Amino acid sequence: PYGAVGQVEPIFCNIRDDASVAQALRGSDAVVNCVGILQESGRNTFDAIQAHGAERIARIAAAEGVSHMVHFSAIGADLEGSSYYSRSKAAGEAEVLRHMPNAVILRPSIVFGAEDQFFNRFANMSRFGPILPIVGAETQFQPVFVDDLAAAAVLGATGAAAAGIYELAGPESDSFRGLMLRMLNVIQRRRLVVGIPMFVARIMAASFELGHKLTFGIAPLALTRDQVRSLSVDNVPTGKCLSFSDLGIETTAMESVLSEYLWPFRVSGQYADIKASAKNLKT
């Protein structure tokens, strides 16, 4: 299912262009749309990518006779949501189902695994000071392992999953603060996790956005106001959709995976366990 060496051919596709999408989908049996953004940039707006882009892929897939479509959305997708991100995700879902009623919609929570942009990002931040600042410290998340998510996508792409919307989350939920403490325990660092109040975060985000705009994109956009709105809402399943249990997939706990890829952020890296063992021998 993951593709043997030499059997995967990467091709360019601009999901804002009908001809590009049609060329990519021509002759396909299934399509999996994983395209999504967390921040808007130029013409790559939430609507352009997550709503209109999803509509274009589904419409052309139907026209090309593609049998199965899997569309990645996100837990919290809501046409009346507080963030542009969540509303664009919901709009994309609606368009996909309009053109491909038999599509499988996957709504994951925060995804973790090697090279993820969640635990890796904050583990890297923890290297540079005694304080780890976060926005939405008490917001609940239920992280899902990337391999479990991939297994769900395979079932959808091969027609082994029933059509519908699946909210996919791991076996454990925790607050943002709790997840950071788990991560710090894995990388063996002691840091003070400080929750930034929402009103302060909104001011910070507005400042970042202004700086980004005035420098024509040179200044980094560390936080946006839309992300602050997203971080004010729990990111856990509603219980109103299908789930991993309907796919027969047993979910993976964070503790069994995090240490496999976060060890480079330990003070002694790969030698941390050896040093700890040697210290115990001396005592």
Q: How should these model regions be labeled?
A:
Residues 5, 122-136:
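A short C-terminal helix-loop "cap" of Rossmann-like NAD(P)-dependent dehydrogenase/epimerase domains
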Residues 199-283:
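A hydrophobic C-terminal alpha-helical subdomain
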Residues 2-64, 75-81:
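NAD(P)H-binding glycine-rich loop region in Rossmannoid oxidoreductase-like domains
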Residues 140-147, 166-186, 195-206, 250-252:
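Substrate-binding strand-loop-helix patch
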Residues 73, 93-120, 124:
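Conserved beta-loop-beta element that borders a ligand/cofactor-binding pocket
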